[in-house]
A protein has these predicted regions:
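Glycine-rich, flexible loop segments associated with nucleotide phosphate handling
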Residues: 26-28, 32, 86, 184, ...
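N-terminal active-site segment of His-dependent metallophosphoesterases
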Residues: 1-68, 73, 82, 148, ...
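Cap/insert and terminal regions of metallo-dependent hydrolase folds
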Residues: 26-35, 186-189, 195-198, 229
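A structural signal for the main folded, soluble domain(s) of proteins
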Residues: 1, 31, 36-44, 135, ...
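His/Asp/Glu-rich metal-coordinating catalytic cores
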Residues: 49, 60-213, 217-223
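Conserved beta-strand elements of the Class I
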Residues: 4, 133-135, 241-243
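Structural beta-strand/beta-sheet cores of well-ordered domains, especially the beta-sheet scaffolds
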Residues: 7, 158, 195, 210, ...
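Binuclear metal-dependent phosphoesterase catalytic core
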Residues: 123-128, 215-258
Length: 258
């Protein structure tokens, strides 16, 4: 069984005043373009599962163009890969702070029954087609208890998809906004008990344990673009992209996109 792990798409992100010939903010167009390239690569890889681990959008109320872009690309993915399961969790940028606001991410669950969205509160999702359980943990409100990280022993494969800060995420002396009251200790998650732990929130591809990774964002974005480039050069990470992971062989491959 193979999965693809993406995170921190930040569709709808805008910066500066430069426009494309079509009148779209240039940085918004850049972010949409790398997402399309990533989806094309994912379709070519034909994985069994696609995990999108938070911050699909840059804001809770994205512009219509960003919503349409995400919907079209996800629908294209599902049409091209009808047997592939898709799991989407909310991140700190696209999780509503008030329950009554609702989440635009729920729209994608309408594509078909193989698109699973967890926008508020953690949830275990059973993917019967590949005998897998996914513990989906979106960005949690400040002070909310951590879930019980317990694999489902009835399933052949157990995976965590978590958007948030895990202890050791940041290099020493690097400040980062939107930090939780306390990061999650790695031993609370217990990656050795899972087949794979997919993380989102940090924009640099980073190995936290042999089977536990931040995949990083697909494009260079604030707040720490220059620090990210420095870290990538220091650790030999070839830019931005996503992860392909083989659950049977425990093998990891990073696919650069930007």
């Amino acid at each position: 069984v193979r999965l693809v792990h993406l995170a921190d798409l930040h569709l709808g992100f805008r910066q500066y005043h430069r426009l494309t010939p079509d009148g779209i903010n240039q940085r918004e167009a850049d972010v949409a373009l790398v997402f399309r390239r990533a989806m094309e690569r994912v379709i070519a890889l034909r994985p069994d599962v696609v995990l999108i681990v938070g911050d699909v959008f840059h804001s809770v109320r994205p512009m219509n163009a960003a919503i349409i872009e995400a919907f079209v690309q996800l629908q294209t993915l599902r049409l091209a890969l009808p047997e592939t399961e898709v799991v989407i969790v909310a991140g700190n940028h696209d999780r509503p702070r008030a329950t009554e606001t609702g989440s635009i991410l729920e729209l994608f669950s309408c594509i078909d029954e193989r698109v699973h969205v967890v926008a508020a509160g953690y949830k275990s999702i059973t993917l019967a087609s590949c005998d897998m359980s996914v513990l989906a943990v979106p960005d949690l409100p400040a002070g909310a208890p951590w879930p019980e990280f317990e694999p489902d022993t009835r399933r052949a494969y157990n995976v965590v998809a978590l958007h948030g800060e895990v202890e050791g995420m940041l290099p020493p002396n690097l400040a980062y906004p939107d930090r939780p009251i306390r990061p999650i200790p790695i031993d609370v998650i217990g990656p050795e008990r899972w087949n794979y732990v997919a993380l989102g929130h940090y924009h640099v591809h980073k190995k936290m344990a042999p089977n536990m990774y931040y995949c990083g964002s697909l494009e260079y974005l604030p707040p720490n673009m220059w620090s990210e480039m420095h870290e990538e050069r220091a650790t030999g990470v070839p830019g931005k992209g996503f992860i392909e992971y083989d659950l049977d062989g425990g093998t990891h491959r990073f696919h650069p996109i930007a």
